[in-house]
Design a protein with these regions (language model features):
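A beta-strand signature from Gram-negative outer-membrane beta-barrel systems
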Residues: 124, 136-180, 249, 898
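Conserved C-terminal beta-signal and adjacent last beta-strands/turns
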Residues: 445-454, 461-470, 475-479, 614, ...
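Short acidic/polar hinge/loop motifs at secondary-structure boundaries
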Residues: 91-93, 120-149, 169, 195-196, ...
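Gram-negative outer-membrane beta-barrel transporters
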Residues: 683, 688-692, 709-827
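N-terminal periplasmic "start-of-domain" segments of outer-membrane beta-barrel proteins
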Residues: 47-76, 110-113, 120, 125
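Outer membrane beta-barrel strand-and-loop segments of large Gram-negative receptors
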Residues: 454, 462-464, 513, 517, ...
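Transmembrane beta-barrel wall of Gram-negative outer-membrane proteins
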Residues: 219-356, 384-388, 612-615
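Structural signature of Gram-negative outer-membrane beta-barrels, strongest in the C-terminal barrel
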Residues: 334-336, 344-346, 380-391, 395, ...
Length: 899
């Protein structure tokens, strides 16, 4: 509740002020309490453990929440040494991290969670998903992370596992200046990595135009004749196109530089006759390299072996540079304790530049000791987000403490991925002795170039107002509000090949693409097999590679929060959402629709639904309470889930297509939690949860052709269920001996089970929704032999997850250390088809050490060791390694100064 409650759970005036400053909360509680009693605070000297000091505020917030939530503060994130929101959230009870970007809450995939920035909807730079990659948010800008696991009417109804609210740092209470510098080294970088020339601005995380398509090339792509031209196209024209591309992409082996980072923050609060003004400005920069050994396979079957094996297999080195920078500028104004305005501006930028040099086995092409293959690919990607958020908080004591809050935001997310390269070299041997290397001598093979662009724009605004009522032994707050957002996305992908058959044989020899496509070669008429250069290009861009999408959400909600005799708290309400979404694909290299207007209208999502929620809290005493939450929510199809065009998922590199008849999933959620907050700061919570899912959205593999990537279909299963138990605790060791109270143990364990029934049953002569969608995609009469397991666990679900942290804070306050352990149980990544078992990611044991030394009140030296065990990450199928990556141990050292 937003208004002050003189109850056993009421916060003290000091705590209210601290919480309001820390989390940018509405000032309703603090203002109402300040009206009751003003205190003069002189000097307070606090002595205590750093962990309990940092966790106390967030625990008190969790205790006073009406709904089940877990909260992680900035100091807790700093203590674990995690560099971004995604890494930090894997420490939260029941959460697992997938691909370093997306969070699975209680085993439900990323589509089952939603992300907000300061309680506002934000865009995503991912071309295939609406959910925001959480690695985009550096820990330097985060004040706290709130994961609400039970639905409340004032949050989006697109809710499955949970809602992640990233709350950024707000205006400081006093002058602040902080600077931090650091460096790190990864043991995997002891091996040399592979590099190419790139652009002059790569250190800034930006391409300077080196990788971009030239105007002459884009003009050719959109012309009536197309990339290949017509019968009148000349050799000179095709030469100009070839030479306009960046061919300075030959790789070489070099040593890797250590990572470096720095951040600066400055802020202040100024009192004046017309109110209080505040400002906080911060910038951060990080540049790091990682060299890892990778293996991957595709096309599981019996080709080339007696039992099962992969027809294609890769094994080699991946070198990746990541450059991240962020900037924030927050402005605040308080007219008085009842009226507050805050403007938050955030800029986030993340560049990834990856080179892979891998040995490539193809059962159809490789002959060991005679003809062997090597594959080189380059992937460059920039992701960024810009967000401006304005919000106001207003209290009216003269109107019985009526309050009114509002917000408005403009955000844009961009993704730019120019100059992608994929080339296969053939190594020739004579009696096992290496003789030469050339472009693969197969007529159908291409050198692939790819260029992707995405813009995602979001406008959002909302408001809520409430009125508290006080009576004999009860308190009641009524609250209404509205949330409104509009999102528009434009994305394009240009893909084409330079054919090996279009190049004369003598020019295909060499092991470096820069040498083969040197100007001296491409300007030579003999380089081309045709006198006019025809056949040199293969346009791989397809219908739907360029698309536009939009959605609009209008929502209103009503909530009542009833508090009786300081013992019972009943919070409930209903949310109504009117949701519209459309995705339109274009024909290749044109602005003409891929589908007819009737077909587009058939896949428009237009839903308006009520979503109820009820939360009951029984407060046994000042330390213990029980919660019960029941709600109904939905999970809607993503932007491309209804398109029949294949697209490449940049995370898995799989080809994915949707189902035009895809429906929203309906969820019934039940949560029960016991919480015990002890006066010493120790705490324990035990939670039971259950979810029933109607029409869960799953993926099934269709087929893979030759060496092509697997093809996946997004479809509705018939039903799904998820249930489990979560335990979360924090205790010091003072119960053993008083001298041991400076050491503590915290952690959480989640045990759960899930099931999904796809709905395949040929015997009933009635097609389920899943069967209909799969038959339409395969153009088949039966699909009973396609899927291996009609009933299985949910994709991405781990049956158990554990986090443990052992820490010590010295009595003199100079030293602090933590050992942090994280592990998850095996989880299905790709469901099995055609008799092959499901592909599972194996458990990964992560062990980190963080030590901090505080020479004085202003300084901090931080030393981290991450991934001490150095375990290999693996996805296995039928006992074979579908994907594997060797990980190193990272050592980092940083120094910060603050006053």
């Amino acid at each position: 509740m937003n208004s002050y409650k003189p109850s056993k759970l009421a916060l003290s005036t000091l705590n209210c002020a601290v919480l309001a400053a820390l989390f940018g909360w509405s000032v309703n509680t603090a203002a109402a309490e300040a009206d009751i009693q003003e205190q003069e605070i002189e000097e307070v000297v606090a002595v205590g453990q750093r962990l309990k000091g940092s966790a106390g505020a967030v625990l008190q917030e969790r205790q006073n929440q009406a709904f089940v939530a877990d909260i992680m503060g900035a100091d807790q994130i700093s203590r674990t040494g995690d560099g971004d929101a995604a890494s930090a959230l894997r420490r939260v009870t029941g959460l697992t991290l997938v691909d370093g970007k997306f969070i699975y809450v209680r085993g439900l995939g990323e589509r089952y969670s939603s992300t907000q920035l300061n309680s506002m909807y934000v865009p995503s730079p991912d071309p295939t998903r609406s959910v925001v990659p959480l690695d985009l948010f550096p820990s330097e800008i985060i004040e706290s992370l709130s994961v609400q696991k039970s639905f409340s009417p004032d949050m989006p109804a697109h809710f499955g596992g949970g809602n992640v609210n990233i709350r950024t740092k707000s205006i400081p209470s006093d002058f602040l200046f902080k600077v931090q510098v650091g460096s790190s080294y990864n043991t995997s970088n002891s091996d040399s990595g592979y590099f190419y020339e790139g652009g002059d601005d790569d250190w800034m995380g930006r391409d300077d135009g080196t990788r971009a398509l030239s105007n002459v090339f884009t003009t050719a792509l959109t012309s009536d004749a197309g990339l290949e031209g017509n019968i009148n196209s000349t050799l000179e024209e095709r030469k100009n196109l070839i030479q306009s591309l960046d061919w300075n992409v030959g790789i070489s082996k070099e040593d890797v530089d250590p990572a470096m980072s720095f951040s600066v923050a400055v802020g202040d609060r100024l009192e004046s006759e017309i109110g209080t003004f505040g400002v906080l400005a911060a910038v951060s920069y990080d540049n790091e390299w990682e060299v890892v050994q990778e293996q991957s396979g595709s096309s599981l079957g019996s080709l080339g072996c007696e039992n099962k094996c992969f027809a294609q297999y890769y094994d080699g080195t991946s070198t990746e540079q990541n450059v991240r920078w962020s900037g924030t500028l927050n402005l605040g104004y308080e007219f008085n304790s009842n009226h507050r305005f805050e403007l938050t501006n955030i800029a986030l930028h993340d560049m990834s530049d990856r080179v892979r040099n891998r040995n490539y086995y193809d059962a159809n092409e490789t002959e060991e000791g005679v003809t062997e293959l090597r594959r080189v690919d380059i992937s460059y990607e920039e992701r960024e987000m810009f967000s401006s958020q304005l919000k106001g908080t207003h209290n009216f004591p003269e109107l019985n403490n009526l309050f009114f809050d509002w917000y408005s935001g403009l955000s844009r997310a961009n993704r730019n991925a120019p100059g992608g390269l994929d080339v296969v070299f053939q190594q020739n041997y004579n009696d096992g002795v290496f003789e030469s290397e050339q472009l693969q001598d197969v007529a159908a093979t291409n050198i692939t170039r790819e260029y992707q662009v995405l813009h995602d724009d979001v406008e959002t605004f909302g408001w809520n107002m409430g009125l508290p009522f006080y009576g004999d032994g009860y308190e009641l707050e009524l609250k209404i509000g509205g949330d409104f957002s509009e999102k528009k996305r434009d994305a394009s992908n240009v893909k084409f090949g330079i054919t090996h058959r279009g190049i004369s044989d003598e020019f295909t020899f060499g092991n470096n693409i820069s040498d083969i496509f040197a100007d001296a070669n491409t300007s030579n008429d003999a380089f081309y097999t045709s006198a006019t250069g025809s056949g040199i290009f293969d346009d791989g861009t397809t219908d739907g590679d360029k698309y536009s999408a939009a959605h609009k959400l209008d929502a209103y909600y009503f909530m009542a929060d009833y508090f009786f005799e300081n013992t019972w708290r009943i919070t409930g309400g209903v949310r109504w959402e009117d949701f519209k979404q459309v995705s339109i694909g274009y024909q290749a290299h044109s602005n003409l629709f891929e589908n007819t207007l009737e077909e587009i209208q058939d896949v428009v999502i237009n839903e308006d639904t009520f979503f109820p929620s009820l939360a009951v809290t029984y407060i046994m005493d000042e330390e213990m309470q029980f919660r019960l939450n029941v709600s109904e929510t939905t999970i809607r199809p993503d932007l491309r889930d209804v398109s029949t065009s294949f697209f490449v998922d940049p995370l898995t590199e799989f080809l994915v297509r949707g189902s035009p008849s895809l429906q929203s999933s309906e969820l019934t959620n039940v949560d029960f939690r016991f919480e015990w907050y002890m006066p010493t700061g120790n705490n324990l919570s035990v939670a039971l949860f259950y979810k029933d899912i109607e029409n869960p959205i799953e993926m099934v593999e269709l087929a893979g052709v030759g060496g092509a990537s697997p093809q996946l279909l997004t479809a509705n299963a018939q039903s799904g269920k998820l249930s489990g138990i979560e335990v979360d605790f924090l205790t010091d060791f003072g119960f053993i001996n008083k001298d041991w109270s400076s050491a503590f143990l915290s952690g959480n364990v989640t045990l759960s089970d899930s099931s999904v029934n796809l709905g395949i049953n040929d015997s009933d002569n009635v097609d389920s929704l899943f069967e209909t969608q799969l038959k339409e995609a395969l153009e088949a009469d039966t699909v009973s032999n396609i899927v291996t397991n009609n009933k299985r666990r949910l994709v991405g679900h781990s049956e158990w997850v554990a986090n443990l942290q052992m820490g010590y804070d010295s009595d003199d306050g100079f030293h602090s250390t933590s050992v942090i352990y994280n592990v998850f149980g095996p989880r299905i990544i790709v469901p099995g088809t055609r008799g092959n078992e499901d592909a599972e990611e194996k458990s990964f044991h992560s062990l980190d050490l963080v030590y901090s030394y505080f020479p004085n009140f202003n300084s901090k030296v931080n030393f981290k060791v991450k991934n001490i065990l150095g375990q290999e990450k693996q996805i296995e199928q039928e006992g074979l390694t579908l994907w594997g990556q060797e990980t190193g141990t990272e050592f980092s050292l940083s120094y910060s100064y603050e006053f």
